[in-house]
Every structure is written in structure tokens, then in C-alpha cells.
Regions:
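Non-catalytic cap/lid and distal C-terminal segments of serine-dependent acyl enzymes
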Residues: 1-187
């Protein structure tokens, strides 16, 4: 939500108008990322922690998702680093929109990450992408995120980025490789 809100009002209005014309469903309705995270952190997690024997500290609390779920998982880690100790971001939808021109979303999100990622050594981050279909669009953006991770001082103890040749943007592909982020985060 905050990367979108960091755009100029004119750019936000342009994306919303574009979406309302049916050309981009991503911004066709209000953005409720912060409300969703508030629900997870303030309602769901306390409910689960109260009713089940859980380890409640950040080093035992992870979040993950695929595609836009990868973006919101990373957003959750940056907004609530005191809650989440790691994030698994599979086939992260770095492109945001499908606009071929003037797509400012990737740059805005990268800037947001540079400002908000927790210090290296305190959290674990996992990213991946495939090479088929929609996933084939992600590599240049993931490489920029990888550069940022290096620049910020993350290393192989707290960051892993993987490319899966032949993997597509699908539940089947994510299921086939889910053990990789789980082993990394839980190790």
C-alpha cells in the first residue's frame, strides 16, 4: 500500500482510471494491504497464539505467499519486523502492473525496500521465480532486488534467491518447490 501511496497523486489517479476502464484489475478497487496486515497481526495471530502452543517470537513467526502474496508477505515483514522474523516470497509479482510504458511500480517498491528492510542478520528473506509464462517477466526485477540485498549486507545466512528453470506461475509449481523456502526459513 505504501509504495502505491508514495506515487504522485496524478500517477495514482491515472492507474485507478486505467483500472476502471477495465485495462488493469490491480488497482480497480481500493487498496487494503494495511487493513489486511492489521487483521493478521492484531486479530489472527493473537487468536492462534492464545489457543495453540506456539512460539510467539519473531524468530519463530514467518509469513509467505506467491505472486501478489509474495509482495504482501515482504510488505508484512517491512511493516511488522517485530512480529515476523522471515518471509517466503515465491514468484514475487515485482512488475505490479502490466503497463508496458511508464510502469513506476517496480522502482517505487525497490525504493521502499531500501528504506524499510530490517537490518541484515535480524530477519530471513527467501525469493524465487520460474522461467515460464508470467514468471518469465520477473528475472530483471528480482536481480535488482538481489543487488539491493547485497548492498544492504544480507548474506546466505539470512537471504536466498532462487531461479527455477522451467517452472511456471502456478500452484503446482509453487507446491513442487515449497520445501526450499521452508527449509531455509526454519533452519
Amino acid at each position: 500500500q505504501k509504495p502505491f501511496e508514495n506515487q504522485t497523486k496524478a500517477r495514482q489517479d491515472s492507474l485507478i482510471a486505467h483500472a476502471k476502464r477495465g485495462q488493469n484489475s490491480l488497482f480497480s478497487s481500493p487498496i487494503y494491504s494495511d487493513r489486511y496486515l492489521s487483521f493478521l497481526v492484531d486479530e489472527l495471530k493473537p487468536f492462534v497464539d492464545e489457543r495453540y502452543a506456539t512460539a510467539t517470537t519473531p524468530e519463530h513467526t514467518f509469513i509467505g505467499g506467491s505472486s501478489m502474496g509474495g509482495l504482501i508477505s515482504l510488505y508484512a515483514l517491512t511493516e511488522y519486523p517485530e512480529v515476523f522474523g522471515g518471509a517466503a516470497c515465491l514468484s514475487t509479482h515485482w512488475i505490479g502492473t502490466f503497463e508496458s510504458t511508464a510502469n513506476t511500480f517496480p522502482g517505487l517498491y525497490l525504493r521502499y525496500l531500501e528504506e524499510r528492510l530490517p537490518k541484515p542478520g535480524t530477519h530471513k528473506l527467501y525469493y524465487d521465480y520460474g522461467t515460464v509464462g508470467l514468471d518469465s517477466l520477473y528475472e530483471p526485477y528480482q536481480l535488482k532486488v538481489d543487488e539491493l540485498m547485497n548492498k544492504l549486507g544480507y548474506d546466505d545466512r539470512n537471504w536466498l534467491s532462487r531461479k527455477f528453470e522451467g517452472a511456471e506461475h502456478s500452484e503446482r509449481s509453487w507446491k513442487a518447490r515449497l520445501s526450499t523456502p521452508l527449509k531455509f526459513l526454519l533452519n
